[in-house]
Design a protein with these regions (language model features):
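Acetyl-CoA-dependent GNAT
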Residues: 2, 6-98, 111, 115-121, ...
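Conserved SAM-binding loop
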Residues: 4, 101, 131
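Short beta-strand element of the conserved SAM-dependent methyltransferase core
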Residues: 55, 160-162
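Short aromatic/hydrophobic contact patches that present stacked aromatics
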Residues: 92-94, 128-130, 161
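Conserved acetyl-CoA-binding loop-helix of GNAT-fold acetyltransferases
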Residues: 95, 101-115, 140, 144
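Conserved active-site alpha-helix within GNAT-family acetyltransferase domains
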Residues: 106, 132-151
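Conserved beta-strand-loop-alpha-helix junction that forms the acyl-donor binding cleft
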Residues: 123-139, 155-158
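A cross-taxonomic marker for long C-terminal extensions/tails that follow the last structured domain
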Residues: 163-174
Length: 174
């Protein structure tokens, strides 16, 4: 069973110790779990809701994720239909190298999406993310969950978006 749990004094060291394979480090763009946790604190302090969560499978920590709720207002998105709108953004998602290839990633991502679909921080039509252009596994996972690439690439990362009501089509991102 997959669970998403808050990070506290009892599990923070375990979150920090999670790691990916050496050949996957380029995919997380040097964004460590500790850095993400610090970013979450900063974002929450600035009034931008951030949820850093530990991923557990049968009471064993297997990964870490973080999503935020903010306005999609980066200059890269100016000509897009979702520009200026509130969205949930997947800030970080990783499964520890010891637990990869067992289907946990998809189950955990589905669990996170189910949480987001409850709109915990406010209304939104969209959830979006970036993934490294060479991360074929991530690309396939996100596509299987309804994410559509927008054609926007920043720092070797591909932007993809999903409409929370399931109605997004290629036309939305053209």
């Amino acid at each position: 069973m997959i669970e998403l749990r808050k990070i506290d004094g009892d599990n923070i060291d375990e979150v920090i110790a999670l790691d990916v394979e050496e050949n996957q480090k380029e995919f997380i763009l040097e964004t460590t779990n500790l850095r993400c946790f610090a970013d979450a604190h900063m974002l929450n302090t600035d009034g931008i809701p951030a949820s850093p969560l530990a991923i557990y499978a049968n009471n064993t920590m297997i990964g870490f994720l973080m999503y935020i709720y903010d306005t999609t207002d980066h200059e890269s998105f100016q000509n897009e239909v979702y520009y200026g709108k509130k969205a949930y953004f997947i800030w970080h998602f990783m499964i520890d190298k010891r637990y990869q290839g067992k289907g946990y990633g998809k189950l955990a991502f589905e669990k996170m999406l189910a949480d987001i679909e409850n709109l915990p921080y406010g209304e939104s039509q969209y959830v979006d993310l970036f993934y490294h252009k060479n991360n074929v596994i991530a690309k396939e996972l996100y596509a299987s969950l309804g994410f559509v690439e927008t054609g926007i690439i920043q720092d070797n990362s591909v932007h993809a978006i999903k409409n929370l009501d399931g109605k997004i089509t290629e036309a939305v991102v053209e």
